[in-house]
Design a protein with these regions (language model features):
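TPR alpha-solenoid repeat register
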Residues: 33, 66-67, 100, 133-134, ...
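Register position in tetratricopeptide repeats
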Residues: 9-10, 43-44, 76-77, 110, ...
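Short coil turns that delineate tetratricopeptide repeat
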Residues: 28, 61-62, 95, 128-129, ...
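Alpha-helical segment of the N-proximal tetratricopeptide repeat
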Residues: 1-32, 36-39, 43
Length: 189
């Protein structure tokens, strides 16, 4: 297992593939190994093999992450309907990751479902109200003709990135108060 992980990190794909296939010969129901193999194939743009691995992993051990991975592959291969379905299923299983909603929104944008794009991105902002997510939602609002909302979000994102003057004062080092130096006490024995 360590060989497979190390090889993937070092981009030694052939070695990683051999290690993972060896694991699967011994334990053919190892969903994690199928997931890793799918990631490996996706990195090499062998999308058909990647999808097959993720689907096997999903059938062995249903998980939101393997569905998300399948969704990403379908998105990459421009099969947006299947990508949408995969992301929807992943969100049904685990709906607390902003990245999942952002990926789903990107697919909906390709399909032309503006309302679903905005709903997904609003949920992403709710989960992770950081400047990057706010800017993505602002762009979606612009595309939907809601420029006032977009501008409001951009201002909010900029505010988050720019420290205010009151927080600058709070962060500024305070001068040390001068302490009176006392003579040490005399010890009487």
């Amino acid at each position: 297992w360590e060989i497979a992980q190390e090889s993937i990190r070092e981009n030694k794909y052939l070695r990683a593939e051999k290690a993972l296939l060896t694991i699967l010969r011994v334990d053919e129901k190892n969903a994690t190994a199928y997931n890793r193999l799918g990631i490996l194939y996706a990195k090499q743009r062998a999308y058909k093999d990647a999808i097959e691995c993720f689907e096997i992993a999903q059938s062995l051990e249903p998980s939101a992450s393997s569905l998300h991975n399948v969704g990403l592959i379908y998105y990459e291969t421009e099969n947006y309907e299947k990508a949408s379905l995969a992301f929807e299923q992943a969100l049904e299983m685990e709906d607390d990751l902003a990245a999942r909603y952002i990926a789903y929104a990107k697919v909906q944008e390709k399909i032309g479902n503006t309302k679903k794009v905005i709903n997904a991105l609003e949920k992403a902002v709710e989960l992770e109200p950081i400047p990057q997510t706010l800017k993505i939602l602002a762009e979606a609002y612009d595309n939907a003709g809601q420029t006032e909302l977009a501008e409001e979000l951009r201002k909010k994102a900029t505010k988050m990135l720019t420290p205010t003057t009151s927080s600058k004062k709070a962060d500024a080092p305070r001068p040390r108060q001068q302490r009176k130096i006392h003579q040490p006490r005399k010890i009487v024995m």
